[in-house]
Amino acid sequence: MVTLKLKFLKALYNFYDEYAQNFSSVCTPGCATCCTHNVLITTLEGVHILFYLENRGKLRLLEKLHSTNYLRPRVTPNQLAHYCIHKIEPPEDDSFIISPCPFLTNGKCPIYEVRPFNCRSLFSEKKCHLGGEAFIHPLLLTVNMIFTQLLEQLDNSGLYGNMLDVLSFLANEENLAVYMKGKTPNHTPGLLPNKPLPGFLCPPEHQLEVEKILKEISHIEREGKNINQCIKLVY
């Protein structure tokens, strides 16, 4: 089942990459202002990265993944959606600092081809170093949240957290074996169990576009199976 989910993950990545081309971006190779150690991913995305490194004989890159005071989320995207839908104040994340991503090599990403959604969805219409932050179109921000929620649901038996924690967890052969069997891994410090999709966080002005996107995604098939068998696409 994990193998099939990996194919759906790649399909969602490809769909998003093509959709995002409708928005302007000033990002170029070597522009790494937003490449920090505060990247949040699912275990499914972590497995995608791990297999990529293994297939290319680059597992040694995992030895670089050491950092401190990085972001460890208190809630998953779908938990956040649940809080917002029910008008509950979500818990605040603990304090963290901004430091470069340990993967960065001479300002470039050695896993760019399989970079997680948190990375591929962060690009700016203006140079980040000028204002200190990325400028993203409001519609794309909504679409980014929708995809983040879908990816969490796709990895329904997995975990969510900082990429450093997720990859460290999966680098343990026993943990990886449990996950690949489709079982929910034991609780691990810094990682949160993925939650069901409670509804999408979408402002009224973006609803029609989101419905259109979800309809197109609903046609994705791999190995004779429809993506609807893994994720809920009803708005």
Predicted segments with their positions:
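Short loop/turn segments that flank or connect secondary-structure elements
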Residues: 1-235
